[in-house]
From Swiss-Prot:
Pfam families: DUF188
UniProt xrefs under InterPro entries: UPF0178
Source species, domain of life: Bacteria
Organism of this sequence: Bradyrhizobium sp. (strain ORS 278)
Lineage: Bacteria, Pseudomonadati, Pseudomonadota, Alphaproteobacteria, Hyphomicrobiales
The protein's name: UPF0178 protein BRADO3147
Length: 164
């Protein structure tokens, strides 16, 4: 295996993740490890590349587990904005299930909007939640995931080459 195809790990915040099957297929195609983290039991394919972690039933147990284990050569898939922020700070690439990448540049505004919407919902000024997940979201996610995998592999290869 060359440094350009060195393995990276995908961490999945699996509770309510609508793209788990897509993640498994892409990861297996690229030969990447997947760690599926949930608050409790979750069914995963029987594949040596895929590992399940039951992080416990605490409020943020799965989020805490993911944040404590990710780093620069990892990709995190989550819709949880505070978790995304923690993982971006750790150097991980982070993607929402709708394909939106979370970056250092976007996290401040994303957190501010999330906090504003939480306040508006709690005051009753805004009702309802996010829009429904669409086939277009699924397609965007797949495209973003492939692009992110290639980018992280290139970054890792460049870092390994510099260390040589």
């Amino acid at each position: 295996m060359t440094t350009e195809t060195a393995p990276i790990t995908l961490y999945v915040d699996a509770d309510a993740c609508p793209v788990k099957d897509e993640i498994y297929r892409v990861a297996i195609r690229h030969g990447l490890a997947v760690i599926v983290v949930a608050g409790g039991f979750i069914r995963v394919p029987d594949d040596p590349l895929i590992t399940r972690v039951a992080a416990g039933s605490g409020m943020d147990a799965a989020d805490d587990w993911i944040a404590e284990h990710t780093g620069p050569d990892d990709i995190v898939i989550t819709a949880d904005i505070p978790l995304a922020s923690r993982c971006v700070k750790a150097g991980s690439a982070v993607i929402a299930p709708n394909g939106k990448p979370f970056t250092e540049e976007s996290m401040g505004m994303t957190l501010a909007v999330r906090n504003l919407m939480t306040d508006l919902r709690s005051s009753g000024e805004v009702t309802g939640g996010p829009r429904s997940f669409t086939p277009r979201d699924r397609s965007t996610f797949l495209s973003t995931l492939d692009t992110t995998i290639r980018r992280v592999q290139r970054q890792r290869a460049a870092r390994i080459q510099q260390q040589s």
